[in-house]
Amino acid sequence: MAKKNMIQRELKRQKCVLKYETRRQLLKKQITLASTLREKLMLHRQLQKLPRNSSAVRLRNRCMITGRSRGYHRDFGLSRNVLREMAHQGLLPGVVKSSW
């Protein structure tokens, strides 16, 4: 299980990304449409002044229950270990054991 502060840090990053998402997209769009080099540099500076954690690249997918970052399944938001246990217990609707 990941440390609780690691999970909280990730949640804080997610909030920051959502907060600055529109501003970041607007600046990137303006950079592509800017005609002069001076404008582009000015817009790049504004983009760099935004917090680092407002970039979506810094997010890491983590299990909602354990905080584990590896073996993460997007469809459920769970790590492979928790997914397996919950599927065996029948806690995930629509998930059935495979047989062929």
Swiss-Prot record:
Keywords: Chloroplast, Plastid, Ribonucleoprotein, Ribosomal protein, RNA-binding, rRNA-binding. One of its GO terms (cellular component) is small ribosomal subunit. Its main location: plastid. GO terms for biological process: translation. GO terms for molecular function: rRNA binding; structural constituent of ribosome. It is found in: Plastid, Chloroplast. Belongs to the universal ribosomal protein uS14 family. Binds 16S rRNA, required for the assembly of 30S particles. Part of the 30S ribosomal subunit. This is Small ribosomal subunit protein uS14c. The gene is rps14.
